[in-house]
Each structure stands twice: as C-alpha cells, then as structure tokens.
C-alpha cells in the first residue's frame, strides 16, 4: 500500500509541468547583499561574456561557473550560443588580449558555488533551481523566476 502511494505520488509529480519546470530550471544567483533583483536575458549574456564589469552601484562582477557537463554549464553554453571548445577559446583569447583579468571561476559543486558567493560580494552564477542554498539570492530573468511559464533558462 505504501509503495503504491509512493509510486502514485512520483507519477503525479512527474506529470506536473510546474514541478518539472522547477526541477530543470537554472536560477541566476547573486550574493544576498547584491541589490539586483532582475536582469534581462541580453544583459545576462553580456555579463557571462565579460562585457559587463560591474553591477549597478559599482560592485565588480565575479563570474562563477560549473564545469563541463553540468546542467548549469549546458544552459550557459546555450545562452551564449557557444560550444564548450568555443567557450574555452573565447576566454583564453579574452585573457590573452587583456580584455579580462581571468577566466570565470569554475567550481565542481553547488557547495563550492555557495562558498564562492560568500567570498565574492559581486558574484553571479547559474545554479539548478532545486539546488539553491541559503546564502544565494535568486534574481529574476526578464521579470520571471525559475518555475514560471516562459522562464528562459531551461
């Protein structure tokens, strides 16, 4: 009986589009003290290619990414319309030309993302919405939070 109820609950969860969207959405997170509450998709692209260097108010932006193969990285590459090799070449060229001081900080886990958010007040990162931790502030993308219909980062 309990097994049947558990399986029924899992089936209902898997058929719920809202629950499915929330589990596959990638949130844009910043440090809790960051005054940002919303970012346009275009500005997010500019941010993650290093074209935007500071938040409104002057705080320097620090890009924090997950490694290749992670869902967050897949969404980042989709956002930037780049392959993994193009992304690596892009950042190598940015640093070589002096247009960036360093490549984005790449971390292997959500726990390390959280720690980086604490260490760098201007940090911004992409995090699977179900993995958002205390100390990470989710901001809207084009006025929408993860889980909303039409949310862009899936």
Locate the predicted segments by residue.
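Exported/periplasmic ABC-transporter solute-binding proteins
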Residues: 21-154
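Sec/Tat signal peptide C-region and signal peptidase I cleavage site
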Residues: 15-21
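Bacterial N-terminal signal peptides
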Residues: 2-14
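Generic secretory/membrane-interface signal
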Residues: 8-10, 19, 140
């Amino acid at each position: 009986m309990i097994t049947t109820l558990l399986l029924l609950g899992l089936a209902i969860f898997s058929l719920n589009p809202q629950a499915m969207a929330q589990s596959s959405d990638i949130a844009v997170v910043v440090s809790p003290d960051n005054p940002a509450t919303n970012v346009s998709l275009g500005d997010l692209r500019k941010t993650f290619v290093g074209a935007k260097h500071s938040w409104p108010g002057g705080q320097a932006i620090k890009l924090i990414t997950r490694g290749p193969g992670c869902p967050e990285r897949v969404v980042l590459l989709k956002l930037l319309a780049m392959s993994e090799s193009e992304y690596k070449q892009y950042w190598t060229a940015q640093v070589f030309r002096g247009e960036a001081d360093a490549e984005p900080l790449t971390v292997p886990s959500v726990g390390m993302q959280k720690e980086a958010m604490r260490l760098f007040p201007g940090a911004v990162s992409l995090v699977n919405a179900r993995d958002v931790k205390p100390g990470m502030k989710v901001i809207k993308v084009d006025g929408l939070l993860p889980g909303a219909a039409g949310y862009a980062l899936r």
